[in-house]
Regions:
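Conserved MFS/SLC helix-loop-helix module at the cytosolic interface between two early adjacent transmembrane helices
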Residues: 47-86
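Short amphipathic helix-loop junctions that connect adjacent transmembrane helices
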Residues: 19-32, 222-238
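C-terminal transmembrane helical hairpin of 12-TM major facilitator-type secondary transporters
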Residues: 268-312
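Cytoplasmic helix-loop-helix junction between adjacent transmembrane helices
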Residues: 92-131
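Helix-to-loop junctions at the C-terminal end of transmembrane segments
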Residues: 50-60, 253-267, 351
Length: 390
């Protein structure tokens, strides 16, 4: 329960800041490409820091790494709120990205604390905390932005600091000492970490699916405020409440539905069905003429994401030894970060040069590819039938 609260409060801060980041960036430069590059910088620091934090959590435990990430988030949001120059804004983004390992470390914590049979449900609860944070965070950010653009970031900084103090007092350790393993520092760089997990033949295809799915998702998240403003004239408050709606959908899916569906259908069917929903609804986002219609479309997209991501993570985790869970989650974070380096920049270029719908049409195509790759790994001999049912 404490871990749920930790992730929830952390994601409130994240949810406050992320929908407003394009508007912070707009104080210093304009254009979708610049916003995309800023998102890519954040992801590049995640890419560098994720495997390092994962390795540290395998060596020293999950607790100290979680606390480090919370403290880093507090300082980064403080810098963002106080930024008066482009250099300080960039520094805030760099620090936020480098210490953004809370979710990956929490997933490793869940892997330590659950059986293989219960892992998808445990990861779904972490996803629900993520979603609840995205309900409260954007709504708070939208309201606070009416006061000033600095207020949301300063409030997020205070939340992260409070979370750090609370965690320091009450968070227990989950990673048992006999499972801890010293890893040479040179092996904690993201390139070698990616190379090692890609050598794990039993999860290689699924890791490719993780990359493709998150390329699509990263482009959507970073580009959506620009898309909604260009097509529907939405401003900060409208975007903030829309992100809150997405959070509600994530909570319903990952907090309730996946726990009911997983015993009945299993991770494989949930993953295939979720990917099919995501690909279809990304295309519908690109084609929708109305902001009102966007709500049910993105609601179904969030349902698909909420089914696919915990199921995919659980399948990969179940194929990995207990002593390597931290490095696995760090490696997954590196893949996510690589997607977030490329996704926002590519979405910005597509938006500026190919048109408003382009990032979402490309995202739908990438998700179809993820569905094909997943089917080839999980459904040998049944791929065609499974794809037909999805």
């Amino acid at each position: 329960m404490f871990l749920f609260v930790t992730v929830f409060v952390d994601m409130i801060g994240y949810g406050i800041v992320v929908p407003l980041l394009p508007f912070y960036a707009g104080l210093y430069a304009s254009g979708a490409v610049f916003v995309g590059l800023l998102g890519s910088l954040y992801a590049a620091m995640q890419f560098a820091g994720g495997p390092f934090l994962g390795g540290l959590s395998d060596r020293y435990g999950r607790r100290p790494v979680l606390l480090l990430c919370l403290l880093g988030a507090s300082l980064a949001y403080l810098l963002l709120g106080l930024a008066r120059t482009l250099a300080v804004l960039v520094l805030a983004v760099v620090l936020a990205g480098a210490t953004s390992g809370t979710l990956a470390t929490a997933q490793a914590y869940i892997a330590d604390s659950t059986t293989k049979e219960d892992r998808a449900r445990g990861l779904g609860l972490i996803g629900a905390a993520f979603g609840l944070g995205l309900i409260a965070g954007p709504a708070l950010g939208g309201l606070l932005s009416l006061h000033s653009l600095s207020a949301p970031a300063l409030f997020a900084s205070t939340l992260a600091l409070t979370n750090f103090v609370f965690g320091n007092l009450t968070l227990p350790e989950s990673h048992q000492p006999h499972l801890r393993k010293r890893v040479p520092l040179l092996r904690l760089n993201p390139i070698s970490q990616l190379g090692r997990i890609l050598k794990m033949r039993n999860v290689r295809a699924l890791l490719v699916a993780v990359l493709l799915l998150n390329l699509a998702f990263a482009g959507l998240v970073s580009n959506f405020p620009l898309f909604s403003h260009a097509r529907f004239g939405w401003e900060t408050t409208s975007n903030a409440f829309f992100f809150a709606f997405v959070g509600v959908c994530a909570v319903v899916t990952q907090g309730f539905l996946i726990g009911r569906f997983q015993p009945r259908f299993g991770e494989t069917r949930l993953l295939v069905g979720g990917l099919a929903l995501v690909s279809l609804n990304l295309v519908l986002v690109a084609l929708t003429p109305s902001g009102v219609l966007l709500y049910p479309i993105v609601g179904l997209l969030a349902l698909g994401t909420g089914l696919a991501i915990p199921s995919l993570t659980a399948i990969i985790s179940n194929r990995t030894p207990a002593e390597a869970q931290g490095r696995l989650m760090g490696g997954l974070q590196a893949i996510l970060s690589l997607a977030m380096i490329l996704g926002p920049a590519l979405a910005g270029l597509a938006f500026d040069y190919l048109g408003i719908p382009a990032p979402y049409l490309i995202g739908g195509t990438l998700t179809v590819l993820a569905l094909i790759v997943t089917g080839s790994d999980l459904l040998p001999g049944q791929k065609t039938e499974a794809l037909r049912r999805a």
